[in-house]
Amino acid sequence: MLSHPATSSVPAMTLADFTNPSLMIPHLRGQDAASVIQELSRILQREKRIPDLLPFYHAALNREYMVSTDMEAGMAFPHARLPGLKELSFALGRSDEPLAWGSKTPRSVRLVFLMAVPATDATQYLPLISGLARLGRDSRLVNRLQAATDSSQMLVALQQVELRTSAKPDLMT
């Protein structure tokens, strides 16, 4: 497990604390950034993590076209920061085949983390980004996520990355 020395008795948060199995798609249907962001936005709306599909989808897509969030580890981190979002959360999609991601210099991506970020909350956003970056540097966990065939396998891999923060969200409901 990627962890840090404990500084309090609060249980350690992991990447899994910001999502749940109903926010994961182990076999994405989308073939490009726009369709994958739409697919993941739909489950964020279905699970009531975002109030309206179109404003969130357009904000995430516009942000992605301005600056691509792809990483060498085969992951992308599109996101939108909007007012009215109640909690920081993300949807995770896994593509069976690599997707060309990025408008200027496309990279192959198989894992897409679409983050819904409240406009007023930067306190939990930074530890989440840091945890996702650490995940990208752990090839063993990236490989586990890329090989996952269901949401429970994806969740187990995310539980291996601990975050530095003291507030724990309750997204498993």
Residue ranges and their predicted role:
Residues M1-T173:
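Cytosolic covalent-transfer regions centered on His/Cys nucleophiles
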